[in-house]
Amino acid sequence: MERSLALANMTRVQQFILLGLSTRLDIRDALFAVFLTLYLLTLLENTLIIYLICSHKELHKPMYFFLGNLSCLEMCYVSVTMPTLLMGLWNGLYHIPFIACMTQLFFFIVLVGTECILLASMAYDRYVAICRPLHYPVLMRPQVCLGLAMISWLGGLLVSMIKTTCIATLSYCGPNVLNHFFCDVSPLLNLSCTHVALTELVDFISAIVILWGCFLTTMASYVAIGRAVLRMPSTTARYKAFSTCASHLVVVGIFYSVTIFIYARPKRIEAMDLNKVLSVIYTVVTPMCNPVIYCLRNKEVQVALHRTMHWS
């Protein structure tokens, strides 16, 4: 009772202070230039991918439909997290209002959840293409692809609504300094002045269901693909089948290795500097590299790109 009264008398935090990626004055300007360049490059690359898919009929296939969704998602990723990162590097400490912080958290969780489900959908598409090629036109017809994409986005939205509501309803009485470059789950839970056991449980369960559930679904698809590829009679056929999956497998490996380490742990390891570095990988580096990874391994995208460059 006394604790409840004490908490009620405390002033609720109206804003948070983001420490940013680095507080070293001697490298902040250089980092700002680097990350601004990466931001613009990411937007350019993913916009180009979406344009190629929309403007070339030979890319109007399920695999590229999902790739277009992924490119859109990557653009949203950097647009949600990069502004506060850049402002922190430009101004030093960045003050973000409570509502803005929760809004950023909401959209970030939406994107993480959506990407998990979307990557699993892309793995299923490759599974059907290689393991059940005769049924591919039926199993991956446009209505199914659209449904999988909608499930991905709505699934991320649902998870985010639950998690963000739990975190936003906690009490934050001070201190209000977040050791991160954007509003993320773990730093916010560390600042709450109320019990967070229930919120941590919700966070952990959602991580298990979304991260591990989609990861295991993706891996099951690739195990089946691997078995099918090994049974193919010719080396050429095996190489062709594997090449259609290699890019996606690289993207999946990078994404899940980082996100599972950060979010799917039963106990938060106090290593925020490490978490910030890992967060940079999947919020900045991965969105920039994904279009390059897909273009380097995909001849159809390369042909479409060459045609576009020739027309221009």
From Swiss-Prot:
It is found in: Cell membrane. GO terms for cellular component: membrane; plasma membrane. The chain crosses the membrane at residues 30-50, 70-90, 92-112, 142-162, 196-216, 242-262, 276-296. GO terms for biological process: G protein-coupled receptor signaling pathway; sensory perception of smell. Keywords: Cell membrane, Disulfide bond, G-protein coupled receptor, Glycoprotein, Membrane, Olfaction, Receptor, Sensory transduction, Transducer, Transmembrane, Transmembrane helix. Its main location: membrane. Pfam families: 7tm_4 (PF13853). Disulfide bonds join C101-C193. It is a multi-pass membrane protein. Residues 1-29, 91, 163-195, 263-275 are extracellular. Residues 51-69, 113-141, 217-241, 297-312 are cytoplasmic. Glycans are attached at N9, N190. CDD domains: 7tmA_OR6B-like. Signal peptide: none annotated. One of its GO terms (molecular function) is olfactory receptor activity. InterPro entries: GPCR_Rhodpsn, GPCR_Rhodpsn_7TM, Olfact_rcpt, Olfactory_GPCR1. Odorant receptor. PANTHER family: G-PROTEIN COUPLED RECEPTOR, OLFACTORY RECEPTOR-RELATED. Belongs to the G-protein coupled receptor 1 family. This is Olfactory receptor 6Z7.
